[in-house]
């Protein structure tokens, strides 16, 4: 009888350990595909996320001064016809390789990856900061591979010192992140480049990365 009790205890322990590892395995499987599941269940959340991304990111009564100091402005890089045509942003740390849309329609721009916020700077006209926005979680039609490649889902994994490259009209512009922040508004307008996305599905908090050009 005592042997059966000991056996039962060991059996219960093994069952508990089995359930523990099964739970860990399920979590590991679900995490990468959770955005896909969420947007399948709640397709309207994509609209809410888009609204938060394009919502005014400059706090009221803040005026952004143009960068007028010519001595610190870097030259436009040389034309390189071996580079891809069009406009792209690459973030090697998180393997992002996203097209940049210059569409006036933010909804259309965000569907294709990164959208450059209008009325701010561009690589060729950097008097104001370049502001690039993208979905964090994207659309239910996106595969996990596509989400990781063109969205800013993994932007929180980037930090100071990480590099960003913009390809713009067959010219290569390199930047380095110097500041990471979670906030409702942009707080540093001295940056050459600002990346941002939403933190959570319904959160007003955004994830910002501020970078300076290096080439």
Roles of regions detected by a PLM:
Residues 1-6:
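N-terminal targeting leaders characterized by basic, low-complexity, disordered sequences
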Residues 9-16, 22-215:
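Solvent-exposed, non-transmembrane regions of membrane-associated and secreted proteins
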């Amino acid at each position: 009888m005592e042997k059966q009790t000991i056996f039962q205890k060991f059996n219960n322990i093994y069952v508990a350990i089995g359930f523990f590892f099964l739970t860990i395995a399920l979590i590991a499987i679900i995490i990468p595909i959770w955005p896909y599941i969420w947007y399948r269940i709640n397709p309207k959340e994509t609209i809410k996320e888009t609204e938060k991304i394009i919502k005014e990111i400059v706090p009221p009564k803040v005026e952004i001064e143009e960068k007028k100091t010519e001595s610190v402005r870097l030259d436009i890089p040389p034309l390189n016809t071996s580079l891809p045509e069009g406009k792209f942003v690459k973030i090697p740390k998180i393997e992002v390789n996203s097209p940049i849309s210059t569409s006036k329609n933010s909804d259309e721009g965000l569907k294709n990856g990164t959208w450059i916020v209008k009325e701010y700077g561009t690589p060729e006209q950097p008097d104001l900061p370049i502001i690039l926005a993208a979905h964090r979680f994207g659309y239910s039609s996106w595969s996990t591979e596509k989400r990781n490649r063109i969205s800013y889902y993994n932007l929180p994994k980037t930090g100071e010192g990480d590099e960003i490259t913009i390809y713009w009209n067959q010219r290569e512009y390199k930047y380095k992140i110097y500041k990471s922040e979670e906030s409702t508004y942009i707080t540093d307008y001295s940056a050459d480049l600002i990346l941002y996305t939403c933190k959570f599905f319904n959160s007003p908090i955004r994830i910002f990365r501020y970078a300076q050009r290096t080439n």
